[in-house]
Regions:
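Amphipathic alpha-helical surface "interface" segments used
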Residues: 125-135, 174-183
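Hydrophobic scaffolds flanking metal-cofactor catalytic centers in soluble metalloenzymes
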Residues: 1-120, 127-143, 147, 151-154, ...
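Tandem repeat scaffolds
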Residues: 160, 164-243
């Protein structure tokens, strides 16, 4: 993954116009300090589209903001999809919100496909990635009419195949298992399949999770002290931030 593509898949709030703070809804029980419907500016958003409490989000009860990641979709939506226009200049914020969700999904798929290609190259995965890189530069209408469900399903299958190649045969499979609150300190999870596993509050301290597949695993409140994650597959910043 070249420097340009790596940067494209990393959020740069300074190049955005606070889109997630306006377009997306949030609730108190999801780690936000208030309830807000979509397409309404956050009460902490300043006139320059910066956050007024960014340095103290967690302390002030806004941990949901600290763990949210758009994977670079926000700045791309601002600069390319809407040609530099901010949400203040767009008439249909509902459409813009839907486009942001589409772009975020594209960017997240690309992030994982690029990792899969880096760890275990596959022509089919590379071809899908190029298709998605092209689609992300499309206009709002094309993005909203694209069959993202089919693309997401194909992406999931290719990532699953890459995961098996990297992890090797015979490793434990706990995909989508409910392991919330479990004491997993003695479990053999090296190279395990933990895709979509519920690991809320689980004790993973000191566990070797390389190269375990953590795609979509819920790590909220998990104890990761001393956990070996260097080689883990498909682990994102928001997952770590939620632990």
């Amino acid at each position: 993954l070249g420097d340009g593509r790596a940067a494209a898949l990393t959020a740069d709030c300074s190049a955005c116009t606070g889109l997630c703070c306006v377009l997306l809804p949030y609730r108190r029980d999801q780690g936000f300090g208030a309830d807000k419907p979509g397409q309404v500016p956050c009460l902490n958003l300043l006139g320059d589209d910066r956050c007024g409490i960014h340095a103290d989000l967690v302390e002030k009860g806004w941990s949901g903001c600290a763990t949210f990641e758009c994977f670079g979709a926000g700045q791309h939506l601002t600069a390319v999809t809407y040609g530099g226009r901010s949400w203040r200049e767009v008439e249909d914020l509902g459409e813009m919100a839907a486009v942001l969700s589409a772009q975020r999904l594209l960017h997240e798929m690309l992030l994982h496909l690029e990792e899969g290609d880096r760890r275990s190259p596959d022509p089919a995965a590379a071809a899908l990635a190029e298709q998605l890189w092209t689609l992300r530069d499309a206009g709002p209408l094309e993005l909203l009419t694209a069959d993202l469900d089919e693309l997401h399903e194909t992406c999931g299958e290719l990532l699953g195949a890459a995961s098996l190649r990297v992890r090797g045969p015979g490793r434990p499979d706990h995909s989508r298992a409910d392991l919330a609150g479990a004491d997993l300190r003695e479990a053999d999870l090296h190279g395990a399949g933990l895709r979509g596993a519920l690991l809320i509050g689980a004790d993973l301290s000191g566990v070797d999770l390389g190269p375990a597949d953590l795609l979509g695993a819920d790590l909220r409140g998990a104890d990761l002290r001393g956990t070996v994650l260097d080689d883990a597959l498909f682990l994102t910043g928001p997952q770590l931030a939620a632990a």
